[in-house]
Amino acid sequence: MTRAPVVIKLGGSLLSDPHDGRLQRWCERLAGEAAGSAVIVPGGGAYADAVRDAQTHWRFSEDAAHRMALRAMDQCGLMLCDLFPALLACDDIDALADHCAAGSTPVWLPSRHLDLSTDLPRDWTVTSDSIAVWLAARIGSPRVLLVKSCALPDGDLTALAAQGIVDPHLPQIATRANIEVRLAHADSPF
């Protein structure tokens, strides 16, 4: 029986400094020695921040902002695949396991599957954190690793959500889906 790949969410904050080497280290490791064992879920980075700013300015709906944030994740994923050609952009959930079995490291682009889905709240209580857990449940992976650039205090997911370290919906979806969620600092060894 083939083991399900781990879902690794690379926070959008990893994309903020192209010279610090953290993003490069994680992507090269995931595309190299860990190839075939992980699916990457990209954060939305500056693209998602732009959606938040535009929503504040224009006051468009949470639903529209959610759909735009999904595309922000797609944009970051496409950028990762261009910067690190060993990574493989994939918008088809059903193909992720096949790509891993073939020894590739897919980067999941979520808008195709989640654009009109009602599986998750369609507002800012859901970010790429909860989306990574949703994907893990969907592909049968029992665990998710969230890679963050911020300080990671001790605490359960509810405490981390209260501190803004993870999104507010994460504790609920992780418990409901029975997914183990771990956090790693971007500077930590893989």
Protein language model features and the residues they cover:
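Nucleotide/pyrophosphate-binding catalytic subdomain
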Residues: 1-189
